[in-house]
Amino acid sequence: DHVIDLYQLIISSWHSYRIKPWTIYGPKGTKKFVKNIMNAWKDERTQRINYEARSSTQAFKIIIKEFKSKGNIRIKDLKITYFEVDHKPVKHAFGFNFLHKNKKLTVSGDTRPCENIMKYGQNADVLLHEVFIDGELKQTNKMRSRRTLHNVRSYHTPSSLLGKIAKLTNCKKLVLTHLVPTKFNEKKLKKTIRDDFGKNPIIGYDLLKIKI
C-alpha cells in the first residue's frame, strides 16, 4: 500500500553513489513483492549498469527482513515499534512508533479507527495520522458512486472521529497526512478536529519539518 516509489528510491540511491546494500523491513510477502519489482525493471537496470560503468552495484543488493504482527527493530539509537492497524480488506497494515532520546513519533499508516492507535500512540510527542475528510467528496454517476464513497470512508479514519482519537492518545501534536480528498476546506477541517482535540492539527505536506 503506497510503495510505488520504492524502485525509484533504490535506483536513485545508486545514481547518488550509494555503495552499500539496502535493508528493507516489512510484513510477510515483502520478499516476493520486492523480487517482483526488481524483476520488472531488470532489463532496464542491466542496460544502465553496463553503459554507465559505475564502480559499485551494491545499492541493488536488497536484504529483506520480514516481521510478524508486532515487535521492535533497533537501528543504532533509534527504536522502532511496529503494530497492526485495521485497514481491511487490505492485509498486513501497520502503524509505527519511532523512539529516540525519550521522544516519540507515532505513525498511523492507513487505518480505520482502531484500539492499537490508542494503545501505541499514548503520550506521543507527534501523532502523524491519516484522515478521510467528511463532506468533501461528492457522489457522481460514474467513478464515485454512493457505494464507492462508503467503502473508501469505511477503511480510513473520518475527520469527525480523528479529534476524539487524538484526545484519547494525549498526543502533544497531531499532524494530518494521507488527506482524502487533496482539495478541502482547511479552516473547516481544523475546527472539526479542534472541537474534540482541543488544539489545532497541523496539515501535513511534502517536505514538512516538525521539531519533536
Task: State each model region's role.
Residues 1-106, 114-117, 187-211:
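Binuclear metal-dependent hydrolase catalytic cores
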Residues 95, 102-104, 113-208:
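Cap/insert and terminal regions of metallo-dependent hydrolase folds
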Residues 110:
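Active-site glycine-centered loops adjacent to acidic/histidine catalytic or metal-binding residues
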